[in-house]
């Protein structure tokens, strides 16, 4: 009955996404700064567009100063958009999109940005029940918005729409940004690549080339993958110690693919390799010829 109750009639609900970023940029501090406010809002709006499947079904009501966290209060008016957002959040795609847009718009190297997220609806921390999507939807539905959209958010949204239509230039305080990368692609060395699902060839190249750094890559992947958190990597190392480095690396990436399913995509692996300073291996997997 719970699953049906969230589907019928007008549906609204509210959730707050809490963000913490370091060390290269503090999103809360940047939002408090007049010159950085618009850029932070644009990062958040693009992330929501990616994760909720478009521009409809939700709106940002207010950004909260929850020092050291930045709270993004979102009102959902469509259960399908809310479900897509929850699925994206649970798979790590929200954090991935947030990281991509932050680095692109604020010109920050990927390896210098660390992000932490938490999703709440009322008193419920949804990170603890993401495996039960209907329960998350119920908590969000029960958490009704207590305010109208903040005037400042409305002004920023209007500014973003005007910029998209070409009515105003990019704010002079920021370097002119590159054309937006499609949500099904990722950027590496200023080139756009299709963000496809990982394949057997990727698994073999990774296992052949990563060597002793497989644990480092595993920890980078583990930032957004529950199956690789805690003692999981050390357990893999112990379990496959006799089989050698190739098998340890192979089992690591296999476990990532099994756990993440359709969210186990090439862009996440390339980003983990960048974070681990293994750019040459990323180039190998992407078939990029090394520079002389």
From Swiss-Prot:
It holds the Pfam family TRADD_N. It is found in: Nucleus; Cytoplasm; Cytoplasm, Cytoskeleton. PROSITE patterns: DEATH_DOMAIN. A motif (Nuclear localization signal) lies at residues 215-228. InterPro entries: DEATH-like_dom_sf, Death_dom, TRADD, TRADD_N, TRADD_N_sf. GO terms for biological process: extrinsic apoptotic signaling pathway; positive regulation of canonical NF-kappaB signal transduction. A motif (Nuclear export signal) lies at residues 148-164. The keyword Nucleus applies. Adapter molecule for tnfrsf1a that specifically associates with the cytoplasmic domain of activated tnfrsf1a mediating its interaction with fadd. This is Tumor necrosis factor receptor type 1-associated DEATH domain protein.
């Amino acid at each position: 009955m719970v699953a049906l109750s969230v589907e019928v009639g007008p549906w609204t609900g509210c959730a707050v996404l809490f963000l913490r970023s370091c060390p290269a940029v503090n999103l809360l501090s940047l939002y408090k700064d007049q010159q950085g406010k618009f850029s932070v809002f644009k990062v958040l709006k693009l992330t929501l567009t990616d994760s909720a499947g478009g521009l409809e079904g939700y709106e940002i009501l207010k950004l909260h100063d929850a020092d050291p966290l930045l709270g993004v209060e979102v009102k959902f008016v469509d259960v399908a958009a809310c479900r897509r957002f929850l699925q994206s959040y649970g798979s790590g795609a929200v954090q991935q999109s947030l990281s991509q847009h932050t680095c692109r718009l604020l010109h920050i190297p990927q390896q210098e940005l660390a992000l932490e997220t938490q999703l709440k609806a009322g008193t419920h921390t949804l990170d603890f029940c993401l495996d039960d999507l209907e329960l998350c939807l119920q908590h969000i539905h029960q958490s009704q918005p207590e305010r109208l959209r903040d005037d400042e958010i409305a002004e920023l949204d209007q500014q973003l729409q005007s910029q998209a239509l070409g009515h105003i230039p990019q704010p002079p305080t920021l370097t002119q940004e590159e054309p937006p990368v499609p949500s099904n692609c990722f950027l590496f060395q200023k080139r756009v690549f299709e963000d496809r699902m990982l394949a057997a060839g990727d698994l073999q190249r990774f296992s052949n080339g990563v060597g002793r750094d497989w644990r480092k890559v595993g920890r980078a992947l583990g930032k957004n993958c529950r199956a690789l958190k805690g003692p999981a990597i050390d357990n893999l190392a112990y379990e496959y110690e006799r089989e050698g480095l190739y098998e340890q690396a192979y089992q690591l990436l296999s476990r990532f693919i099994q756990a993440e399913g359709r969210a186990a995509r090439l862009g996440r692996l390339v980003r983990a390799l960048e974070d681990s300073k293994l750019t040459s291996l990323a180039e190998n997997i992407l078939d990029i010829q090394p520079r002389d």
